[in-house]
Amino acid sequence: MQDFTKYLSTAPVLSALWFAILAGLLIEINRFFPDALLFPFG
């Protein structure tokens, strides 16, 4: 189990988890506020 927790704290696993969370957050923001880039120019 200690090896598994050490594996989960390695850089590729943490970066993949971070990018998945970030992508989900961006998708949800775009779902609730679509075309947010067009607001300042509108």
Swiss-Prot record:
What superkingdom does the record give?
Answer: Eukaryota
Q: Where in the cell is it found?
A: Plastid, Chloroplast thylakoid membrane
Gene Ontology CC terms: chloroplast thylakoid membrane; photosystem I
Q: Where are the transmembrane segments?
A: 7-27
> What are the GO BP annotations of this UniProt entry?
photosynthesis
Q: How does it sit in the membrane?
A: Single-pass membrane protein
Coiled coil where? none
The UniProt keyword set, sorted, is:
Chloroplast, Membrane, Photosynthesis, Photosystem I, Plastid, Thylakoid, Transmembrane, Transmembrane helix
Biological function: May help in the organization of the PsaE and PsaF subunits.
PANTHER family, per this entry?
Answer: PHOTOSYSTEM I REACTION CENTER SUBUNIT IX, PTHR36082
Member of which family? Belongs to the PsaJ family.
Q: What is the protein named?
A: Photosystem I reaction center subunit IX
* Organism listed in the record: Chlorokybus atmophyticus
Q: What is the lineage of its organism?
A: Eukaryota, Viridiplantae, Streptophyta, Chlorokybophyceae, Chlorokybales
Q: What gene does this protein come from?
A: psaJ
